[in-house]
């Protein structure tokens, strides 16, 4: 039982630390650990996060981190994340495996897409291969792994419309973060792999690319119920040079931090907390 509580607490801490941008309060509910949580087809999520308007959620990063932890514990199933609208709130539910009776619990299941309109009693189910399938048409095959590209979700949630935008973030160059992670690793007594990709023209600025398809206009009979393009972000959101989603040195940091994690599992959360705060601190939004 103590091992179960420790694992549940660790998984919830990963969500709390990395799902949102630094400084953002996470409205998270954690389940009580018990045998039912680890059973195949369990309908009990490990945790539930209430999503709010105008935020970016690092879904693939957290999902892959969960996969690593569960593989280390020799857990036989892959986690499943479900974003659902029950009419009262939009929530992210994190399960250790696919729950039974998805349709009866979460209504109509929609596919991950660039733009998903999420009316009442609909959901988006995210499992092992969904992130790769989504990125296949957006990045080169060599960039499909989480070290080179990462899926994030931007929310647009109001009283009149609930919508999600799934975006792919690519780092142009990881060099800016290498020195930061090297300092962290030395402080913790780690010896991370110092190899990194070659730099581009913007390596000094550490800029990132956002790859996405254009928002589609509404068509009659569209299963997603898309009423048109998403509005621009609220006023005050800064626009990075060249447009796109600026997550400073994002994927370079993921690569460096994850390599440290694989080498020293029990210190990974300390490394990750500092490192993720570093690369997410420069996040900027554009409409």
Curated annotation (Swiss-Prot):
Residues 284-287 are nuclear. It is found in: Host nucleus inner membrane. Residues 195-212 have a biased composition (Basic and acidic residues). GO terms for cellular component: host cell nuclear inner membrane; membrane. It holds the Pfam family Herpes_U34. Residues 1-264 are perinuclear space. It is a single-pass membrane protein. It comes from the Viruses. The chain crosses the membrane at residues 265-283. Residues 191-244 are annotated as: Disordered. Keywords: Host membrane, Host nucleus, Late protein, Membrane, Phosphoprotein, Transmembrane, Transmembrane helix. Phosphorylated. The keyword rRNA processing does not apply. InterPro entries: Herpesvirus_viron_egress-type (IPR007626). Belongs to the herpesviridae NEC2 protein family. Plays an essential role in virion nuclear egress, the first step of virion release from infected cell. Within the host nucleus, NEC1 interacts with the newly formed capsid through the vertexes and directs it to the inner nuclear membrane by associating with NEC2. Induces the budding of the capsid at the inner nuclear membrane as well as its envelopment into the perinuclear space. Forms a heterohexameric complex with NEC1. This is Nuclear egress protein 2.
